[in-house]
């Protein structure tokens, strides 16, 4: 390593900046026309900023709160379940600048450094915590979609990560990336921006369609939009002795769960198992991870909620055998079965083609309809897009330290038969359309990043 590299990096002697690929990226970009990023942004603190730690006061009533985004939820596809930060605090002088605006670039700046998201139209009015750095591009100087694609590329990510400091919890600050060189790529910038914007629009449209599907189930079945503000609330109730022969825990018989069951019965509900829905859970086994060519893509219960679906690791093929109880199929309903109630447990994801063939973690339940009268999109919409479905899933949680959803209890949940077959197919079509849009969104974003990388490699031509 030449000593000039040390000089150019503030005489840093830790190995991070020199082994991450940042130096090579800077050397390549030095041969091109570039502009420091701070000259391409505008707004609070020059357009690149995070915040200071603050006391978080959460509320339950949406009228008095704003959705609050954290580093753990930044990359999720569905932001409708975010916690609510006090609106009074959020709109104060101290925190008002943490509001997210469309076309901002959001970067995690503490812990896992350099995870990024492009602020979509449905993120307007959401506040973020202090560990998410915001980059606000100046539209008169640069296209926001292009800048995002560049920062996500194999040239941008290493340079962002190279500025990290801290031995235990790593951080970056705005000044560490302010002078990051941004190459000017001519027409490719507009093309990359268009791809990123189309990807964002497809993601927003997908969310609207899923919301429409859930509302349709509620309307047809006469369900309220919201049964309770949380999965578990402090309350008291009574239950028939015949109903406590299998479950004696009070949370299973809480009044919200009882109400959810009652209105499902009123909608002529029958058990999922009687409706031809099969359930699968992966065996608990020693997990040996290998290179891609020797393994099957593996995903955890946290990974299924991500906007971008990619293998986290590859599970050794020989461990899986010929039995495919571990396999995710397209159109499965995936339910997170472990965790704390109020978190991801009981939340579900629609398996579009991106997840087909993945090996599922033992912490994921897979529900697979086999009866055409109950199409997969309808099953997903009832369980995962209505509060009634969620409350019925959450009530089945058992265990004191780390609750889990028993598969047999989940298959006993009643699904409404009130919707006519044509209405069920309509809901099914909506869910499938939403899945295709999410797949399209990911494909467009990958294309944009590849376009930027290819243009840089060709010298900006």
Task: Place the predicted regions along the sequence by residue.
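Elongated alpha-helical scaffolds
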Residues: 98, 102-105, 129, 142, ...
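Short, surface-exposed loop/turn microsegments at beta-strand edges and helix-strand junctions
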Residues: 57-66, 81-86, 98-100, 118-130, ...
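A short glycine-rich beta-alpha junction/loop motif
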Residues: 126-133, 165-187, 357-365, 396-423
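Sequence-specific dsDNA recognition surfaces
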Residues: 35-57, 72-102, 270-286, 302-330
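Short hydrophobic-aromatic micro-motifs
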Residues: 67-70, 100, 105-108, 297-300, ...
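A short beta-sheet element
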Residues: 96, 110-149, 326, 330-383
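Non-catalytic DNA-recognition/assembly elements of restriction-modification systems
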Residues: 1-54, 186-286, 419-461
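Short, positively charged
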Residues: 144-171, 377-399
């Amino acid at each position: 390593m030449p000593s000039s590299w040390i000089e150019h990096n503030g005489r840093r002697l830790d190995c991070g900046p020199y082994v991450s690929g940042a130096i090579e990226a800077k050397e390549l970009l030095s041969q091109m026309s570039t502009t420091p990023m701070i000259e391409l942004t505008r707004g609070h603190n020059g357009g690149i900023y995070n915040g200071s730690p603050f006391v978080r006061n959460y509320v339950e009533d949406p009228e008095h709160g704003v959705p609050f985004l954290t580093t753990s939820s930044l990359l999720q596809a569905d932001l409708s379940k975010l916690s609510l930060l006090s609106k009074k605090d959020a709109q104060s002088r101290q925190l008002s600048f943490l509001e997210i605006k469309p076309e901002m670039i959001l970067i995690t700046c503490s812990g896992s450094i350099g995870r990024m998201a492009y602020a979509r139209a449905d993120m307007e009015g959401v506040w973020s915590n202090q560990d998410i750095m915001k980059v606000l591009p100046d539209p008169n100087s640069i296209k926001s979609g292009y800048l995002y694609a560049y920062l996500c590329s194999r040239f941008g990510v290493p340079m962002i990560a190279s500025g990290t400091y801290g031995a235990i919890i790593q951080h970056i600050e705005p000044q560490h990336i302010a002078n990051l060189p941004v190459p000017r790529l001519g027409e490719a910038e507009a093309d990359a921006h268009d791809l990123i914007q189309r990807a964002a629009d497809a993601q927003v449209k997908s969310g609207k369609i899923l919301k429409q599907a859930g509302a349709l189930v509620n309307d047809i079945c006469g369900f309220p939009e919201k049964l309770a503000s949380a999965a578990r609330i402090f309350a008291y109730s009574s239950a028939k002795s015949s109903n406590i022969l299998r479950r004696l825990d009070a949370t299973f018989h809480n009044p919200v769960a009882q109400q959810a069951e009652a209105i499902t019965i009123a909608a002529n509900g029958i058990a999922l198992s009687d409706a031809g829905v099969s359930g699968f859970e992966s065996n608990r086994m020693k997990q040996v991870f290998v290179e891609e060519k020797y393994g099957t893509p593996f995903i955890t219960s946290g990974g299924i909620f991500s906007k971008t679906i990619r293998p986290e690791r590859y599970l050794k093929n020989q461990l899986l055998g010929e039995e495919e109880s571990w396999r995710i199929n397209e159109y499965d309903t995936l339910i997170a079965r472990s965790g704390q109630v109020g978190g991801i447990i009981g939340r579900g994801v629609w398996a579009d083609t991106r997840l087909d063939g993945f090996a599922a973690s033992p912490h994921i339940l897979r529900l697979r309809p086999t009866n055409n009268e109950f199409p997969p999109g309808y099953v997903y919409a009832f369980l995962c897009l209505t509060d009634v479905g969620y409350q019925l899933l959450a009530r089945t949680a058992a265990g004191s330290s780390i609750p889990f959803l028993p598969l047999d209890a989940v298959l006993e949940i009643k699904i409404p038969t009130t919707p006519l077959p044509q209405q069920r197919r309509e809901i099914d079509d909506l869910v499938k359309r939403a899945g295709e849009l999410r797949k399209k969104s990911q494909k467009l974003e990958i294309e944009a990043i590849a376009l930027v990388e290819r243009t840089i490699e060709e010298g900006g031509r």
